[in-house]
Amino acid sequence: MKNLLQTLRPDLKDKLSLLNEEYPFTAHRIIKDLEATDNVFDVTFLTMATMQKFLGVNLDDFYFIFEPDVERG
């Protein structure tokens, strides 16, 4: 089964790579948390808030950044 880092949208993977160059500690924290699980509901709020701040992820769309094939209802 794939972990969340593997299912992350390509544009966000690129942003995460750029973040790794400027803020390596923050990027490693996000990467570690996303690699640790395959369930989006297991991601901590701290990780979600960090992704919102540094990667521009909208918390309302958080589930959809891992499941791009799922249509919003």
Predicted features, each with a name:
Residues 1-22:
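A short, Lys/Arg-rich alpha-helix, primarily the initiator
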Residues 5, 35-37:
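A generic structural signal for short
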Residues 14-18, 47, 58:
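Residues that mark the N-terminal boundary/hinge immediately upstream of a DNA-recognition element
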Residues 19, 23, 27-34, 62:
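Conserved hydrophobic/aromatic packing and binding residues within compact polymer-binding modules
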Residues 23-26, 43, 57:
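Alpha-helical hairpin
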Residues 34-35, 47, 66:
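DNA major-groove recognition helix of helix-turn-helix
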Residues 38-53:
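Short, basic-rich loop-to-helix N-cap that marks the start of a DNA-contacting helix
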Residues 53, 59-73:
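Short, charged recognition helix plus adjacent turn
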